[in-house]
Amino acid sequence: MKDKKLLLDRKCHVLYSKPCKKEIRAKIALHYPEAERETIWKQVQRQYADFLSDWRTDLGGKRNFHNGVGGTYDCIAIMSYYTVCKAVTSFREIEEMEENLILPTFRRLRFVDCNKPFWRRLMYRAFVRAKGGCDKWHDYEMTVAPYETDKPIYYEFTSCPAGEFAIRHGLTDIMPALCNVDYASMELLHARLIRTNTCVNGCRCDYTICGDKDPYLKEHPEYRDEAGFRRNK
């Protein structure tokens, strides 16, 4: 089915990104014979449209930076794929799909080193700018702690549309695969993420970010919980 034929309210919703579509179709090709692939893809498309038919209409559409590649709507598209293809896909595959959407941008920023005060302050400013976008759309409700020299950066979300969507549709089992990319993205900036909760398994999604050489890390070893979330003690 051509994307333009999907029944979406395009005044408030956006289509999955082209990279996301490519990822989903590539995974379908891995699991299904050629004769079935187009049918499966149409099922994913219809599931996506069905999910959005009674979903929030206040997320800003194309104007909201959270709705780009790897963002809220791509997460919904991946959950559509998961819903249709649950019998053949896996947790790691879903995790890989989100990584393939998010990490290319961070790989281009490998020169950033969170261990250095200059880059740490620039990262902090980037998070403050992101909060401005969140305040405009009230999608990911974000709080950023004041900057303190020689201390980790801290911010948190108390609202997450992707998590809200997963809870509503009984898809929380796959949310760890979509959230864990936050760890991988920070690692590409010579940084480490320390997280104890997300909006799916708690009341907030917390981000403590420090350089990968910071002694603070020793106090908060990473582990995977039973659900598959990467977390810290």
Enumerate the language-model features and the residues they cover.
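N-terminal, charged low-complexity regulatory/assembly segments
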Residues: 1-85
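A short, structure-level motif marking secondary-structure boundaries and short turns
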Residues: 66-67, 166-169, 224
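Amphipathic interaction/junction segments at domain boundaries or subunit interfaces
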Residues: 73-168
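Short, hydrophobic/π-rich interface segment
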Residues: 142-201
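Short, charged/polar, Gly/Pro-enriched secondary-structure boundary elements
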Residues: 162-164, 212-219
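Short, cationic low-complexity segments
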Residues: 184, 222-233
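C-terminal edge-of-domain segments
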Residues: 196, 202-212
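N-terminal functional module detector in eukaryotic proteins
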Residues: 206-208, 219, 225
